[in-house]
Structure formats: C-alpha cells, structure tokens
Amino acid sequence: MTTPALAWKLLLLCCLLMPLAARTAPAPRELLDSGHADEALRLLNGASGSRNAESSNYLCRVYYSLQDWDNAIRHCERAVKSEPGNAVYQLWMGRSYGQKASVSNPVWAYALARKTVACFKVAHELDRNYMPAARDLAEYYTTAPAIVGGGNDKALALAAEIAPQHPSDAAWVRAMAAASAGHPEEAEREYAEAIRLDHDSATTYLDLAHYLRGRKSWDRFQQTVERAMQSPRIQPADRYNAAEMLLRTERNLDQAARLLLAYIHSENTGEEAPVFRAHFLLGEVLRKMGDNGQAAAEYRAALALASNYRPATDALRRLGQR
C-alpha cells in the first residue's frame, strides 16, 4: 500500500471514530447528574477550556455538592465575572455565599448574607421565569432577618409577581410567609393550594411535610410523606428528599433505606440529589439501624465517587475504619 493511500485510510478511520469518541466522552452535566464528582473534577480541571465561564460554573457546582464552600465561591465568582448576565451563574454564586454564611462567624455571615440576597435578586431580575432563582429568593426573604434583607412583605410581593405564570410556586411562597409570620392555619391552606395547583405532585407534598416536621406534627408528617411517595407525579429526587427527612426525624428508617436504594439504582438521578450523598445517607440510616458493616460499605461507595466528601470520611473514622 502506498504512503498516500495509507494516509487517506487513516484519515478516514479518524473521521469515523471521532463521532464515537464524542458520544462516549461524558459531559460535565452528565457527571454531575450521575454523582461522579471525582471524574467531573478531573474532566473540568484537565480541559483546555477550564477557565471559561461554563466550566467555572460546573466546577462551582461540583465543589458545592462536596460542601467545599470556599472552592465553590472561587469558581462561581470566576463564572460570574466572565458572564454577569447569566441567571444560572448568579444563582449558584448566591447559593455558595449562603452556605458559607451558615458556617461563618457573625461578622462574615452578615457580609455573606448580603452577597447572597444580592445574587438571588440579580438572578431573578435577569430571568423572571427562572423559578429556582425566584424560590431561593423567596426562601431567603422568609427566613432571613430584616437587617440582612429579609422580610415577609418582600416575599408576598414576589408571590404576587410570579402568580400569573407560576401559581403553585406563588402559593408555596405565601405558605412560607405565613409560616414565618406565625400563622399556621394560613400556612397549611397555602401549602394545600400549592399541592392542588401542581396536581398532587410529590414535591409539593414534601414541602408540606417539611413544614409539619418543623411543627413536630409527627403523625401528619408521616402521612404526608406517604402521600408524596404514592403520588403519580413523583420524581426520583423526591424519594431522596423523603428519605433524608425520615432520617433526620429518625422515623421509619426501613422506608428511608428502601427509598435511597431505589434512588441510587434509578436511571434518572440528578445534581440536586448527588448519588454519592445518597450512599452516605444510606450509610447513616444503616448505622442508626445497627448495621455498622453495611454502613461502612455505603460510606466507601460515597468516597469511590467523591473522594473528598468529608462527611463520609468522618463517618468511617467514627466507626474506627478507613
């Protein structure tokens, strides 16, 4: 075979293989959704474009899932500096500031809280139909003190704004405001309205369950979780969230374990419920049930996906294992 002919055959082979490589190479979002934090970091840090806004935002979100707030902030600030008009980037920067504020001393927490609400407001102003930003802003308004920009009046104004296009979300905001103001009957009416408007979705039932948990209304809490899990409009992440609530209340741990296993083995996991953290939560459930051996196996499964996830490392250490 002549050299030119060989060269053409090699070129043709490369052209045929390139689409296959493109299909098999995981994208950052796919790795986030499947909970492969270590692999996502390797991909993003090794990419030639790792300093562009999109990659910086993904790095922020990976570190956020790992509860590494300092690195999350660093990369989110880089993304926002490159593209300040991106609502998604502003939202994730606000979330990172908020989480850092929750573990900071009062002076730093005050400054970070101000940054948090500023980012949420910018994100909402950039895209008023982007409900994750609107909901985070509403939650901030109903939970933060006025000195750092909170206020039920602001939450209710936001609810009125989004109500025409997003009535269920608006009812949820009104429920949060009523709960914050100490009006439990009104809060429950609005939670019920959110459930009705969202056609009995599991997510809205879990919003009500979260409220009932805070009021220590345990029987109704358990009933509401059950209704959420029986909803025809249930998403895989709803099972994760229900299991976490059951774990935190130390109620019905058998069900919590089943829900986490169902989520881990589903084909539709997501960034909002990291798979490595589902393994960690399952380990916590099993430990509380007295099965330290299986708990350790779940902690290790979490670390296999996210080797820097400190809660799993600490949990193994408490069990006297590595």
Which residues make up each language-model segment?
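Alpha-helical adaptor scaffolds
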Residues: 29, 139, 143, 210-214, ...
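Residue-level recognition of tetratricopeptide repeat
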Residues: 29, 52-54, 61, 86, 95, 102, 130, 167-169, ...
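Short coil/linker segments at helix-helix boundaries
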Residues: 31, 67-81, 85, 89-129, ...
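Structural marker of alpha-solenoid helical repeat scaffolds
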Residues: 49-50, 82, 126, 162-165, ...
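Canonical tetratricopeptide repeat
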Residues: 58-61, 92, 136, 173, ...
